């Protein structure tokens, strides 16, 4: 049986739709009354593991799931050995540096050396500031990173931005974009190499599906 790791939250609905177009019905995971974390398809051909977004590449890299759907931001942050198979085109956002609108900073290089930068994505942030040769102190936060500059704990943040509304509502502005992110279909490398054709069939079917307007 093929096991697919699906992230709870914002990517789930579009992930289910994409697999449905490829012939795998995981719609039961969308049932508000569902409490199962391992959900088989009605045909018994595959099963879905419902996991946190950040855990998808872990399940795939260890081979507990042969396929998974996860944001590129998570892949870049965790750097786990998974095969990136398809850019699915939904869940679009960007990783950005943001500061208080009143700070006067116009770009990342305006930030003072050794200033504090708050982020959930400290690996991505470190890689970016190292590329600028700008030493900063990174403060890891698990949520509401916007509070860093608001409270004065940090000069800036590095975080995902979709519409930018949360930043605006909290008096912050973007000054740099690190990279663009979207949902990716990933695979367990060894499983893909030893595939008898079943995984390739699914990947090919998913790749052939054009993103709907609702997904883009």
UniProtKB/Swiss-Prot annotation:
Gene Ontology MF term list: ATP binding; ATP phosphoribosyltransferase activity
Catalysed transformations (reactions): 1-(5-phospho-beta-D-ribosyl)-ATP + diphosphate = 5-phospho-alpha-D-ribose 1-diphosphate + ATP
Upper classification of the organism: Bacteria, Bacillati, Cyanobacteriota, Cyanophyceae, Synechococcales
UniProt function note: Catalyzes the condensation of ATP and 5-phosphoribose 1-diphosphate to form N'-(5'-phosphoribosyl)-ATP (PR-ATP). Has a crucial role in the pathway because the rate of histidine biosynthesis seems to be controlled primarily by regulation of HisG enzymatic activity.
GO cellular component, one term: cytoplasm
Originating organism: Synechococcus sp. (strain CC9902)
Matching CDD domains: PBP2_HisGs
Predominant location: cytoplasm
A biological process term (GO) from this entry: L-histidine biosynthetic process
Gene3D superfamilies according to UniProt: Periplasmic binding protein-like II
Protein name listed in UniProt: ATP phosphoribosyltransferase
Stated family: Belongs to the ATP phosphoribosyltransferase family. Short subfamily.
Cell compartments where the protein resides: Cytoplasm
SUPFAM superfamilies: Periplasmic binding protein-like II
Enzyme Commission code: 2.4.2.17
Subunit structure: Heteromultimer composed of HisG and HisZ subunits.
Pathway: Amino-acid biosynthesis; L-histidine biosynthesis; L-histidine from 5-phospho-alpha-D-ribose 1-diphosphate: step 1/9
Keyword terms, alphabetized: Amino-acid biosynthesis, ATP-binding, Cytoplasm, Glycosyltransferase, Histidine biosynthesis, Nucleotide-binding, Transferase
